[in-house]
Structure formats: C-alpha cells, structure tokens
Amino acid sequence: MGAWLFILAVVVNCINLFGQVHFTILYADLEADYINPIELCSKVNKLITPEAALHGALSLLFLLNGYWFVFLLNLPVLAYNLNKIYNKVQLLDATEIFRTLGKHKRESFLKLGFHLLMFFFYLYRMIMALIAESGDDF
C-alpha cells in the first residue's frame, strides 16, 4: 500500500509543481504586460482551489495511512491553504492585482520550492517502498 501511496504522491505533487510554474509564468507575464489583469485572474482563480484540494487530499491520505512525518511536512502549506480558503482570500482580484503582485509571486515561489523538495522526497520514499515490497516477495 505504501508504494502506491507514494506513486500517487509523486503524480499529484507533479501536478501541483507544474501548477506553481504556470502561476509564476503568469505573474511574470503580467509584470511584463503580456497579459491583462482580468485574464490573469480568470486563469489563476480557476486553478487555486483545485491545487489546494489536491494537496489537502494527499495530506489526508498520508494522515489516514499513518505516515505522520510526511503529514507533518505537509501541514504548514495545508494550514496556509486552509486559512486562505477559510478567510475567503484565496481568489485574486483584478482591481488589486498590481498592488499585491509581489506577495503572490513570493507565495508562488515558496510553494514552487516546497513542491520541488517534496517531489524528491516522495520519489525517494516511493523507491524505498518499492524496494521493500519487492524484498517481501523472496
């Protein structure tokens, strides 16, 4: 079961990683005036809630399967996402985006770094779980 969970974690984390890259590119495009604020907010707002939901579901799976350490690693980002959703500030506003662009870029870079580190952690744990499961067959 552990190997399948970490395979799923690698896949879900890749989706979130590419989402953060997409957000970062969109913020850079807005800064360079290649995209207008309404278009940026429309694109980003469609993806913010699914990104948080995927991360939350993955964290919940780790908690339910007894991987406490992995759950605790995910807890700060999970708490941050839940706090934003609870306070209803997860969506971007086109009228305020230029004023808050620096904050959103910093958040995107931090999440990008988090998901990149977690990708290698999940990959390592997946390989170790696959080796452990293949060792049980002999």
Swiss-Prot record:
Domain of life from the UniProt record: Eukaryota
Name of the molecule in the record: ER-derived vesicles protein ERV14
Consequence of gene loss (knockout): Defects in cell polarity. Strains homozygous for ERV14 deletion do not sporulate.
One BP annotation, GO: endoplasmic reticulum to Golgi vesicle-mediated transport
SMART domains in the record: Cornichon
PANTHER family xrefs: CORNICHON-RELATED (PTHR12290)
GO cellular component: cell periphery; COPII-coated ER to Golgi transport vesicle; endoplasmic reticulum; endoplasmic reticulum membrane; Golgi membrane
Keywords, alphabetical: Endoplasmic reticulum, Golgi apparatus, Membrane, Transmembrane, Transmembrane helix
InterPro entries: Cornichon, Cornichon_conserved
Membership in a protein family: Belongs to the cornichon family.
Signal peptide limits: none
Source taxonomy: Eukaryota, Fungi, Dikarya, Ascomycota, Saccharomycotina
Subcellular location: Endoplasmic reticulum membrane; Golgi apparatus membrane
Extracellular side: 28-52, 133-138
Organism: Saccharomyces cerevisiae (strain ATCC 204508 / S288c) (Baker's yeast)
GO MF: cargo receptor activity; signaling receptor binding
Membrane-related topology note: Multi-pass membrane protein
